[in-house]
Amino acid sequence: GTARLFIAKGKVDNFDTHKLLDFLEKTTGVNKRNIDDVKVMDSFSFFAVPYEEAEKVLKIFQQKSGGKKSLVSRAKAKK
């Protein structure tokens, strides 16, 4: 299965689907072919990765945040 993640980057940060995929691949080492269901909004985006990659992605962004709120978190379930 896949995990849906939220990232606090969007169009105002000059991101589109292509740039977000490149950024995620470069930052996490996750092959962009494994990143799916990308939705880029104005100030945030969503993407899906396989469960086993999700923990790695969350951990990497948690470490990069230096104790501040991480750029990436689990997306809240759709109501």
Each model region followed by its residue ranges:
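Terminal-proximal interaction/regulatory segments of ATP-powered molecular machines
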Residues: 1-79
